[in-house]
Amino acid sequence: ITKMEISEKPKRPESNREYLTLDEVKRLMRTSCGNEMVKRAFLFSCFTGLRLSDIEALTWDRIRDSGKGMQVESTQIKTGKAVYVPLSSNALAQLPERGRGRVFHLPVRYTMGEILANWVKRAGITKHITYHCSRHTYATLLLTFGANLYTVSALLGHTDISTTQIYAKIVDENKRKTVDLIPDIGER
């Protein structure tokens, strides 16, 4: 078997990266979830970009004062890469009362998926939202509000900037849609 040249390898189709807008995040914050810990964990991920596996493993000793504010210092389960994520006031507001051991005590993933789907529906959001969409939400919100692509990439723990550029493309598409909201007035 011979190795394929990079140019010969079939390209994977870009997946649809569903995310929440800021208004949708606010709507979820105002809507009862049915499980307060699932609600807090999901919103915490919307404000930190942490994957579900990292949220499930997050312990209180990983949340520390850096001298410039609170941050999560953790090793990503998926990649083994160390990440340092400063915590905004929005993220801090989602933390449960400080204790020992794990920060978020969550149900099994299947149950959590059902809770999340029902919560999103109750909030009147018609998108197909999974837990991982919280990570997409974080990246998209940061870029929408002017964050540097390289900083977002570092916060997400991406090893390749092209992974983060997918979110920049989403933001660019939203800019086009927004500009097109002004109807053509027909006069030149």
Which positions does each model-derived feature cover?
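Basic, Lys/Arg- and aromatic-enriched nucleic-acid-binding interface segment
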Residues: T2-L52, E56, K78, I185
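Short, leucine-enriched amphipathic alpha-helices that occur as contiguous helical runs
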Residues: V25, M37-K39, R109, G113, ...
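C-terminal secondary-structure termini that scaffold catalytic or DNA-interacting sites
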Residues: I182-R188
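Short, polar N-cap/turn motifs at the start of nucleic acid-interacting alpha helices
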Residues: R62-G69, T126, A147-I166, K177
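Catalytic-site neighborhood detector that most strongly recognizes the C-terminal catalytic loop/helix
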Residues: Y19, Q76-G80, R109, L156, ...
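C-terminal catalytic core of tyrosine-transesterase DNA break-rejoin enzymes
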Residues: L43, F47, S53-D54, N118, ...
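Active-site/catalytic core of tyrosine-dependent DNA strand-transfer enzymes
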Residues: P86-T126
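Catalytic tyrosine of NAD(P)H-dependent dehydrogenase/reductases that use a Tyr as the general acid/base
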Residues: Y131-H132
